[in-house]
Amino acid sequence: MQILRYTLIALLLMVATIAAAQDLQTQIQECEACHGPGGVSTEDDVPSLAGVDATELTNSLEEFYFYERHCTTTTYRHGDRPKTPLNMCNIANVLSADDRVALGEYFSRQ
């Protein structure tokens, strides 16, 4: 029960941190912390974002936003971010519709 409590607290803190990110570059860095620099993943369980069609990426973020996709809990893989648990539904939920489109467009060009 304690582990669940600490996990939920960590997730809430992570969501609050992501929600505070206002500019696209900060949001890109958040994505790259799991999906790798430039959106090129080196992890078997984390997909690459680079070069994927912008509409497909945006639609995926929309599906996470509306909890229409399974949201596996994972941790940041790259950079100096704390290795606290998080999932794509919570991440997508703090992004505006414009943010989701902008991120899809950015990673499609990588």
Segments and roles (model prediction):
Residues L11, N90-Q110:
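C-terminal capping alpha-helices of c-type cytochrome domains
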Residues A21-E32, S41-T42, A50-N59, A97:
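Sequence context surrounding c-type heme c attachment/ligation sites in exported
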Residues V15-I18:
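N-terminal signal peptide c-region/cleavage motif recognized by signal peptidases
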Residues C31-G38, L103:
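The canonical Cys-X-X-Cys-His
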Residues Q29, T84-P85, R100-V101:
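Structural micro-motif
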Residues M1-L8:
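Bacterial N-terminal signal peptides that target proteins for export
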